[in-house]
Curated annotation (Swiss-Prot):
Belongs to the Cu-Zn superoxide dismutase family. Keywords: Disulfide bond, Host cytoplasm, Virion. It comes from Vaccinia virus (strain Tashkent) (VACV). One of its GO terms (molecular function) is copper ion binding. The lineage of its organism: Viruses, Varidnaviria, Bamfordvirae, Nucleocytoviricota, Pokkesviricetes. Disulfide bonds join 52-102. Superoxide dismutase-like protein with no enzymatic activity. It comes from the Viruses. The gene is OPG175. GO terms for cellular component: host cell cytoplasm; virion component. Gene3D superfamilies: Superoxide dismutase, copper/zinc binding domain. This is Cu-Zn superoxide dismutase-like protein OPG175.
Length: 120
């Protein structure tokens, strides 16, 4: 399982990439955005030393998230991405090609704690 922590200005969230019943899912929540539709995109680099300006070009479109009128998005998406290939890359939340927030995708503590992850 992989995890990405988003913490940029007032935009915060946790996004997990995990196998659920044999399929890879993207799960989590994000707060602090205005209501509307936003894109989750994986970028080439996990370098956030200059915020979202240093994460490189977009590589994989994960899907769209929908933020409700309270500024909350609940994420539950299917993905074909191989989780092991995205470790160390960045995930951005974007709208109209503008990167609003981003974070680095890392190995989740649950992997180390349990050696495997199972969804019950």
């Amino acid at each position: 399982m992989a995890v990405c922590i988003i913490d940029h200005d007032n935009i915060r969230g946790v996004i997990y990439f995990e196998p659920v019943h044999g399929k890879d899912k993207v799960l989590g929540s994000v707060i602090g955005l205005k209501s509307g539709t936003y894109s989750l995109i994986i970028h080439r680099y996990g370098d956030i030393s200059r915020g979202c300006d240093s994460i490189g070009s977009p590589e994989i479109f994960i899907g769209n998230i929908f933020v409700n009128r309270y500024g909350v998005a609940y994420v539950y998406l299917d993905t074909d991405v191989n989780i092991s290939t995205i470790i160390g890359k960045a995930l951005s939340i974007s709208k109209n090609d503008q990167r609003l927030a981003c974070g680095v995708i890392g190995i989740s503590y649950i992997n180390e704690k349990n050696n495997t992850f199972s969804y019950n």
